[in-house]
Structures are given as structure tokens and as C-alpha cells.
Amino acid sequence: AATLRDYQTKQEHDIEMMRKQWEHGDPNHRVTLDETEIAKVVSNMTGIPVQQMAESENIRLRNMGKVLKEKVIAQDAAIDKVVKSIQRNRMGLKDPNHPIGVFMFLGPTGVGKTYLAKKLAEEMFGSADALFRIDMSEYAEGFNTSRLIGSPPGYVGYDEGGQLTEKVRRKPYSIVLLDEIEKANTQVFNLLLQVMDEGRLTDGNGRLIDFRNTIIIMTSNAGTRQLKEFGRGVGFNAGGIGSNGMPIDEKDKEYARSVIQKHLSKQFAPEFLNRLDEIITFDQLDLPAITSIVDLELKSLVKRIENLGYHFQMTDKAKEFVASKGYDVQFGARPLKRAIQNYVEDGLCELLMEGNLKPGSVISIGKNPKKDELTFKNMIKD
């Protein structure tokens, strides 16, 4: 007790000395706190993105569709549906005892379902960290369902909290991404019904978790296998629609959507589908869309090259070549990253290892007209 008393006395004396030093210090060197700094502190303490309010809410909502379309290529219809649903909620036209939005993203792999969720998190809440991704294939068995809300008292993991409820409790302003929802057990859907309908869920500790400030997005590949089997599926058969890289017309897109929607009604219960705000079908990507995505994928590479002290430029023919090599009608944009690695990054790596580049050099990438490859030239910046 005496030791603690002495420690307390010393701490109080130190605080008093620092206070006097601060009061008699140089006023010209005092730290000034403005509303932006206070907003950041409040945001860190509460998990609420207060700094987003610096921009007018109406202006941000009005420009959201335009911003997302610049980042997510060839999915304008899907973006419009998501943005309009969010705008209705934020303007107070929807039930307040309901999540901001509950969406189901449908479509084949590599068309931007998860990517749109990430960009939506950045635009809505200011950071990609606001996205919680849960792989629903881990909840295919019924006994795993309790992991979402936390184990009941007396069971292993009772003190850890649920993988869904605990994250939302700590960060209520977020996007919950339930990936491949069709693989989840039926008990998971029973849990989600309450969240989708009332915006709340009770965890294993008996606490009521508020989902009213979250966006819930479920992704599914339902119906894409049926598109392959029908032989007329968009880009799924060898000689089918879109397999030659030509733009896919609206009639074929509507046919693909109808096939997916028909299979969706067979796979999910009506009471589950009725609680969704929007069921959004993503269109298959064609070659012009992949060519546009090349520019987005190269931005991060350009930054890495500039961090090394060099500059980087690429001709349109070289971009078209990479797009054609990275275009697979069945897998969307995923093969594009491998094509950039194999044809662009490997060539840059060889050029860097030669040791002939000087600080400020410009690396020019073009298409070899005689061979099926790219050319890399070392140019000095003027």
C-alpha cells in the first residue's frame, strides 16, 4: 500500500509539473486541434467513419454511381441497382429497422462481384477494411452455424464471440460479404432471416447486435453451370456467344439472366428471396471490357515502377495484346492478372536485372509485329 501511495504521489507531481510547463510554454508552438482531427479521434474510438461527413452526404450519394463505374468495368446495370437502393435508405425512404441494403450478387466467376463489394466499402465507409468477408463453404454443416453468433455457455469458444456478430458489434458501420452463399447450411439462412427482416441478431452471450448500419452482400454462382449445359450460355461453350471476344448484345444478356433467375428460385426458399432488397445479375465480360480493365490493373504496377525511380509507358497495341492473352470467356478477368505477370512483369524483371537502367529512365513497352510477344525498350526521360 505504501509503494502504491508513493507511486501515486509521484505521478500526481509529474502531472502537475507538466501542466505548469504547458501553461508557461511558448504560445507560438502550441498544437491546434481542428474539427478534422477531432473527427478522426471520434472515428478511431467508435468505429464510426465520422470523417466521411466532411463531404456533404447528398453530394457523395449523388456521385457514388459515377465513382463506382470508373472502378468496376462493364457492370453499369448492377451498380445502378445497388446505388439506388442505398440512396433510398440514406434519404430515409426505407424502414429504419432494416440494414442499409441486403443484396445478392449473381453471375459467373471473375466478373467483379467481390470487387464491387470492396469498392463499395471504400466509397461508403472510407476504407476497404470496412468489408468483412465470410466464406460460407465453412458453414456447410449444421454444427458450424453457431460459429457465426458465438458458442453457447459451456461450449468451446464461448468467450471468443461469433465470427459475424462480434465483427459487427465492434464495427457496426461495415459491409458483410457472405461469399458463395449457396454452400451454406439451411440453419444459416434461418439466422439471416431475422437480420434481413429486423436488422438485429442475438449472439451467444445474449447481446443484441445491431445490423441497421451494415450492408449485407451475398454472392452466388447459382445457374452458371446451367448456362454451360444449355449450349447457348453467354460465353460458356466453345463456339457460343461472346467466345470470340465480340461484344455481347443485350438479348443474350437477358437470356443469361433469365436462366440464372430460374435456377435461383429452385435453390433458395421464397421467404429468403422475398427479404432481399435486390437480386443483381452480373453480365459476362467481353474482350472490350477486359481491355478497359488492363488500364486499372496496370495502375498498381506503374506505382511500383515509379517507387523504384523509373517511369513506365505502354502502347495501345501492347495493351490489346495483353488483354487478348488474358481473356478467357469462362473465367472473366481472373486470367488477366496472370497474363500481366507472364508478359509484362517478367519482361520488366529481365530489363531491371540487366542493370542498364538509370534513375529517371522511361521503360517503353510495345508489341512485336513479327512475333507474339512484347518489346521492352530503355529510354532516357527528357
At which residue positions do the language-model features occur?
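AAA+ P-loop NTPase nucleotide-binding core of proteostasis motors
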Residues: 2-382
